[in-house]
């Protein structure tokens, strides 16, 4: 009898969707995750004499190991020697200790009940390696002692969240933009196309813009007080007196938080290929930085996201063979079997936080309509709400784990004990 014991809703399966930018976790069957906190975590390594700073809200790692500061409130407090690190690289787990710290934190602070009571469905990158999948399976069963486990590709979950089992998922997150063809609930590996032009790339472009405009980036943690100043006038603010010696990685993280707010508030994708004249006619957007400096942004707000669609005019991209967003989609479809292409063009599903830049989907729709073969019907599926687009793979996981028909799919503890960690390759496509 394979895992038939678990009925979806009664057990309260947990769904984890851990991305490069945020961690989303919650109970299956609910419509949005219970928690959503940054994947970046603060890490303080003990000093040589074995003393650490006062522990208040840190999660102690292994004995004598580093102390981790997780979730926004703990991470954004300036501390001496605290590095901001990310457990993921290229969408896959790289640093297992800090990854485990994130899971510990979620269980302790948010689930607040024994890990052994809840089956876990976890999302994974479509290019995750066999070794990492097996290691994760082993961690969940051996360390957390969970009753059942399942790993599912993010793209498949996004398709399910949109009520489809076939479609082309265009996922643009923090570290990369990918087009992933899904057919009948399976990822077609040969059709995956990845581009590094995504949210972090836009953050870098914004940083360069601020340098050109001589705008000083001051994260809020440095500011004691500020005065209102007129538009374009130099900022008038006072620095906090007693600031600890922070690390460069952490200061950088705090600066990026400011830039990401700017990205979400100001940037917009131009309707058609960027044109100086047209951009100059667009309405400007007023933005105030944390230190009180404020000004209007005009053409710049269209110019920065242009790199996503037309990488050719971005300076500093070497040899520039990168693909714009719409090229990523058409290239991916072109690598799939000719018979399934209509099904892919017929549901291009847009997901990921980076696609929330204003007018992103309009521009994508426009470019794809020009590139789609006349014999095929193009349909772009993009949720209007930020929640559904940012959490799409979590929502798909929530739907999947609470389906009655899914309950026989879990890898049960018993199966794991009999077949070892290799069973993940067999049971989770």
Curated annotation (Swiss-Prot):
Record field: transmembrane: none
Gene encoding the protein: ACTL6A
Disulphide-bridged cysteine pairs: none
Quaternary structure annotation from Swiss-Prot or TrEMBL: Component of numerous complexes with chromatin remodeling and histone acetyltransferase activity. Component of the NuA4 histone acetyltransferase complex which contains the catalytic subunit KAT5/TIP60 and the subunits EP400, TRRAP/PAF400, BRD8/SMAP, EPC1, DMAP1/DNMAP1, RUVBL1/TIP49, RUVBL2, ING3, actin, ACTL6A/BAF53A, MORF4L1/MRG15, MORF4L2/MRGX, MRGBP, YEATS4/GAS41, VPS72/YL1 and MEAF6. The NuA4 complex interacts with MYC and the adenovirus E1A protein.
Name the record gives this protein: Actin-like protein 6A
Pfam families the UniProt entry points to: Actin (PF00022)
Organism (species): Macaca fascicularis (Crab-eating macaque)
Presence of keyword Phosphoprotein: yes
Taxonomic placement: Eukaryota, Metazoa, Chordata, Craniata, Vertebrata
UniProt xrefs under CDD domains: ASKHA_NBD_Arp4_ACTL6-like
């Amino acid at each position: 009898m394979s895992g038939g014991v678990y009925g979806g809703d009664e057990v309260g399966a947990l769904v984890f969707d851990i991305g490069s930018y945020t961690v989303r976790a919650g109970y299956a069957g609910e419509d949005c995750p219970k928690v959503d906190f940054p994947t970046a975590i603060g890490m303080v390594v003990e000093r040589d004499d074995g003393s650490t700073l006062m522990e208040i809200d840190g999660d102690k790692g292994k004995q004598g190991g580093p102390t981790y500061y997780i979730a926004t409130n703990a991470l954004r407090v300036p501390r001496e020697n605290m590095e901001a690190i990310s457990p993921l690289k290229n969408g896959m787990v790289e640093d297992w200790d800090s990854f485990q710290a994130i899971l510990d934190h979620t269980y302790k602070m948010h689930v607040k009940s024994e890990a052994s009571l809840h089956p876990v469905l976890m999302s994974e990158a479509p290019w995750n390696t066999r070794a990492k999948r097996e290691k994760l399976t082993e961690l969940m069963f051996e360390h957390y002692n969970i009753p059942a486990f399942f790993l599912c590709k993010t793209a498949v979950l996004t398709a399910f969240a949109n009520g489809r089992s076939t479609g082309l998922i265009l996922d643009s997150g923090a570290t990369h933009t990918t087009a992933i063809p899904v057919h009948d609930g399976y990822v077609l590996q040969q059709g995956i196309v990845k581009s590094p032009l995504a949210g972090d790339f836009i953050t870098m472009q914004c940083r360069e813009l601020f340098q050109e405009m001589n705008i000083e980036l001051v994260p809020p943690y440095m500011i004691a007080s500020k005065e209102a100043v007129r538009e374009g006038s130099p900022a008038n603010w006072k620095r906090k007196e007693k600031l600890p010696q922070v690390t460069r990685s952490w200061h950088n993280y705090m600066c990026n938080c400011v830039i990401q707010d700017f990205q979400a508030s100001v940037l917009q994708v131009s309707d058609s290929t960027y044109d100086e004249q047209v951009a100059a006619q667009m309405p400007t957007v007023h933005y105030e930085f944390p230190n009180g400096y404020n000004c209007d942004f005009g053409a710049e707000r269209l110019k920065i996201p242009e790199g996503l669609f037309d990488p050719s005019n971005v300076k500093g991209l070497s040899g520039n063979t990168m693909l714009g967003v719409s090229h990523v989609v058409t290239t991916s479809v072109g690598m799939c079997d000719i018979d399934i292409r209509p099904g892919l063009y017929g549901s291009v599903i847009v997901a990921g936080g980076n696609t929330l830049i204003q007018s992103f989907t309009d521009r994508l729709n426009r470019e794809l309509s020009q590139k789609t073969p006349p014999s095929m019907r193009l349909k772009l599926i993009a949720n209007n709400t930020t929640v559904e687009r940012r959490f799409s793979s979590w929502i798909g996981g929530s739907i999947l784990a609470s389906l009655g028909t899914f309950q026989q799919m879990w890898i049960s503890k018993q199966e794991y004990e009999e077949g070892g960690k290799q069973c993940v390759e067999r049971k989770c496509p």
